[in-house]
Swiss-Prot record:
Organism this protein belongs to: African horse sickness virus 6 (AHSV-6)
One Gene Ontology molecular-function label: structural molecule activity
Any one GO cellular component localisation term in the record: virion component
UniProt keyword annotations, A-Z: Virion
Subcellular localization, as worded in the UniProt entry: Virion
Family: Belongs to the orbivirus VP3 family.
Name of the protein described by the UniProt record: Core protein VP3
Keyword flag Cell membrane: no
Pfam families: Orbi_VP3
Length: 905
């Protein structure tokens, strides 16, 4: 027993140092492993190229991100909902009682809460200002994105009426201050708020009226319209597209999740819509490497590297005791871990033509094994494609393979096999053979026709039937193999061939390489299974929104030959000569499909939807920069991009920066991306679009540019009649109903303020204007507004606050001044409370109190209303779903492998 344990431990140690050797199964790779490997190789290549450049490029020496963690993060975003289900709308108005029995103050609580979002605006920090705008937009969407279900109601004389808790007005605290007749009027108004029955599609709902702030109501209406529209067809369209995708990917639909959408008590909600607009994903600046690695991690199946029957070698290249030909010499070699990494690169290049291409790895010691090089020259012509539409290798590697094949045909020169050289002296420019001489120019690389490689004489890129993804209509057919064929490894490949393989056998026979020709002929079924599996993987598993678009795919080879730089230049990975042999005698056999394959459409949709939302944010921030240049005087287009990225979900940001591409994104990329018209419709996008439409009026975000200075005295009324004073409900505010006359306003720009400050006359000029009862406006700045209520005299820092900051200091004997217009303005409301014991001059002071700042807003945030009109704001029509209705968010159910009951509406 101890001996067996020692042998087992020894075997485990050997496997630890040789992880690729396990009998016929050499290695097992899956999508995440290969994606990390590909990303490491790509980043290593990028860093090496940058170190070789004469000009210093941005340093990207960062850690390699974990692709699966990023994808899992995006999948986790699907759990987040862009709405909430509540049983009562939020209170949009609150009532402040006064000493008057006839009047009360009503405050729009939405604007009150909005004023608390964010800090002061700084004109020298554009990113901070943009972040403030995005934060306010997020608050606006969270306030209005709600669905009502199971609202509280009452029975009154056989009618169903609304409970006071759901009408959106908080007034109970003011009832004790009102007269009995006014309370009765309010009660009668409440008794008349009848709940009506309505229909959404064919679903029964409750319809009632409530008070709601206009911005919240607009967001709420958009959400309600989105849900109502889904009931009529969007779900059916999504399911039909998933069925098309399942047929293309050969995914069987399971019956694990069946939902009967025809039930009249079900309302379904879809946050993400299908199909995906893949152009949104590919419009992202510098995205092709990130999309490539995401495609690998998301869709590539788990597979193992299998070797052919070893008897093929025994009856062909190793049948003699004395082994002198190149194939027989290397047939017993065992690959190292580095060489197996090169095999991985080769299969990645075969699975991603025109995206990953290969080049020969330069040997620093100049000690290339001539045997391996010649064998690789032969096998490379039947392993790789070089034209006319796609390629797996660079032009340099094609020339090296031609030279290696030429050396292989000529290394045993003798009189028995004559050779007639051509006039050019280039590799393969000769005719070889005794009787029927073969023109070896047929194997010299020509990317225009694909001559010499697998693409010659076959149509390896076709557009046969419509694809579920509009941007990828191509079907890859390596070796003219249809990927829809059933592959049985026991019989597949028998009596199959393709043009370049036939020509290779003819050339080897003409050159007297009978053993090698016999070996390749016996390897042909194994070789055809290899490319049949690759075709299946490319056309089925790897088909996704992250696949390279046809318009980019078709021009890669042309740009590569002409030396043109495109948007999606291929990634070049270097391999050794030996790895071509090891890749030829191994094939990638899928053993399990990716675990993320069924959820891939939803992950793609969520990613595209977030990108569309970010793109809209950049567009709107750039427009806002043009509207209020004084607010962001030093802003650049790249700062819009940075602010949006800062606000984006972390998984989305990490996926966009998967290859550290943010270090290379320039202003041109940002502007072009923000001007793209492709969008991915989703609930989040629709809500964000409406939120930006609301934000066009800055006052809805509690940002105001009409802030003035005028010196006025704080009202100090005489208390001649305390009852009358109480009845009027006297209050004071620094918010004015209308803007002052233009002729009375002195507008101070930065230039004017700096000029007067440098002349030492700034404070004197301000004082002179205020003494003349004039108005002063400092710039066109947007200032954040705070709302405060006082029942006694406000503090001096609020009354005497100025909408600017003026600093003066002396540096090295030089007087320095600085201005800052971006300050927070306070809108205060002073409620006067008096007692019967007060004398007429109780509110009067000997020295008057002055207030300086005046704010003009078109929005009426605080209103004084008559007591019977407390419910006058209850004028918005709302739809609420009944408590027994089922609100089902079926977004997570839109998976490729889940068959849903199709709606019949």
């Amino acid at each position: 027993m101890q001996g067996n344990e020692r042998i087992q431990d020894k075997n485990e140690k050997e496997k630890a140092y040789a992880p690729y050797l396990d009998g016929a199964s050499v290695s097992t790779d899956n999508g995440p492993i290969l994606s990390v490997f590909a990303l490491q190789e790509i980043m290593q290549k990028i860093r090496q190229n940058q170190s070789d450049m004469a000009a210093h490029a941005p340093d990207v020496d960062g850690a390699i991100p974990e692709v699966m963690t990023i994808i899992s993060g995006i999948k986790g975003l699907l759990e987040e909902k862009d709405y909430k289900v509540i049983n009562a709308p939020p209170n949009s108005f609150r009532t402040i009682p006064m000493q008057s029995m006839e009047y009360v103050l009503q405050v729009n609580t939405f604007y009150e809460r909005m004023s608390e979002i964010g800090g002061p605006v700084d004109e020298t920090d554009p990113i901070g200002f943009y972040a403030l705008i995005l934060e306010k937009l997020k608050f606006l969407k969270s306030e209005g994105a709600f669905i009502l279900q199971g609202i509280a109601t009452k029975d009154y004389r056989g009618a169903e009426i609304a409970d006071p808790e759901i009408i959106g007005v908080s007034f109970q605290n003011a009832l004790s201050h009102l007269a009995a007749i006014d309370r009765q009027i309010i009660q009668d108004t409440l008794n008349g708020m009848i709940i009506e029955n309505g229909l959404v599609a064919d679903r029964n709902v409750d319809v009632f009226r409530a008070a709601m702030s206009d911005p919240i109501y607009r967001i709420r209406n958009v959400l309600q319209g989105y849900i109502e529209g889904i009931q009529y067809g969007e779900l059916r369209e999504s399911v039909n597209w998933l069925m098309r995708l399942g047929l293309r990917k050969r995914i069987e639909f399971a019956n694990d999740f069946l939902t009967d959408f025809r039930r009249a008590d079900t309302i379904w909600i879809i946050s993400q819509r299908l199909p995906i607009n893949a152009n949104v994903i590919w419009n992202v600046p510098r995205c092709h490497i990130a999309n490539l690695n995401t495609n690998v991690a998301l869709c590539l199946p788990t597979g193992e590297y299998l070797m052919p029957n070893p008897r093929i070698n025994s009856i062909t290249i190793t049948q003699r005791i004395t082994q002198t030909n190149p194939f027989s010499i290397i047939s017993g070699l065992t690959p190292t871990a580095v060489q197996m990494n090169d095999v991985r690169k080769i299969y990645l290049a075969l699975m991603f033509p025109n995206q990953i291409i290969l080049d020969i790895k330069p040997d620093s010691s100049h000690a290339v094994d001539p045997v391996l090089r010649m064998v690789a020259g032969v096998l490379g012509h039947v392993m790789f494609t070089y034209g006319p539409i796609m390629t797996n290798i660079t032009p340099t590697m094609a020339e090296l393979l031609d030279a290696a094949l030429s050396d292989y045909l000529l290394y045993m020169y003798n009189n028995r096999i004559p050779i007639n050289y051509g006039p050019t002296g280039q590799p393969l420019d000769f005719r070889i053979g005794a009787r029927n001489q073969y023109d070896c120019n047929a194997f010299r690389a020509d990317p225009q026709t694909g001559r010499g490689y697998n693409g010659w004489g076959v149509v390896d890129v076709q557009r046969v039937q419509p694809s579920p993804y509009d941007h990828v209509q191509r079907v890859i057919r390596y070796c003219d193999i249809d990927s829809r064929e059933i592959i049985d490894p026991r019989t597949y490949g028998m009596n199959m061939t393709y043009p370049i393989f036939r020509e290779m056998l003819r050339m080897l026979v003409a050159a007297g390489k009978d053993q090698e020709a016999a070996y390749l002929r016996q390897m042909l079924p194994f070789h055809m299974i290899r490319f049949a599996r690759i075709n299946q993987i490319i056309n089925e598993d790897l088909l996704s929104a992250f696949s390279l678009p046809d318009q980019n795919f078709d021009v890669v080879l042309h740009n590569l030959i002409q030396g043109n730089f495109g948007e999606t230049d291929p990634v070049i990975l270097e391999v050794s000569w030996a790895s071509i042999w090891f890749a030829f005698v191994r094939r990638f056999e899928p053993i399990a499909r990716s675990d993320l394959l069924e959820a891939a459409p939803l992950i793609e949709a969520r990613y595209a939807a977030e990108l569309s939302t970010m793109q809209m944010d950049v567009q709107q921030l750039r427009m806002m920069r043009a509207r209020v240049p004084d607010t962001v005087i030093n802003a650049t287009p790249s700062q819009c991009w940075k602010a949006v990225l800062k606000n984006a979900p972390e998984p989305i940001k990490n996926l966009m920066n998967l290859s550290h591409s943010f270090s290379f994104v320039n202003v041109r990329d940002i502007v072009r991306w923000s001007q793209q018209r492709d969008i991915q419709e989703s609930l989040a996008y629709v809500l964000n679009r409406e939120a930006w439409a609301i934000a066009n009026d800055f006052e809805d975000l509690m940002l105001v540019d009409h802030v003035y200075i005028q010196r006025t005295m704080l009202p100090e009324p005489r208390l001649d009649d305390i009852n009358e004073f109480r009845r009027q409900g006297f209050f004071h505010t620094n918010m004015i109903d209308g803007a002052p006359p233009i002729g009375d306003v002195t507008h101070y720009t930065y230039a004017i303020a700096n000029l007067q400050a440098n002349m030492g006359q700034f404070r004197a000029a301000i004082r002179r204007t205020l003494d003349d009862n004039g108005w002063i406006q400092f710039g066109g700045m947007l200032r954040n507004i705070k709302i405060k209520f006082f029942d006694s005299r406000p503090p001096d820092e609020i009354l005497t606050a100025m909408p600017y900051v003026y600093t003066e200091e002396e540096r090295d004997g030089v007087r320095m001044v600085a201005f800052k217009y971006a300050t927070t303005a306070t809108a205060y409301f002073l409620l006067y409370n008096v007692e019967y014991s007060n004398t007429p001059d109780t509110l009067i002071t000997v020295n008057p109190t002055f207030t300086m700042t005046k704010i003009h807003m078109r929005k009426k945030i605080v209103r004084r209303v008559r007591a019977p009109d407390v419910l006058s704001q209850v004028n918005k029509r709302l739809v609420a779903y009944k408590g027994k209705m089922r609100l089902m968010d079926v977004t997570k159910c839109l998976k490729t492998g889940v068959q849903l009951a199709r709606p019949t509406i």
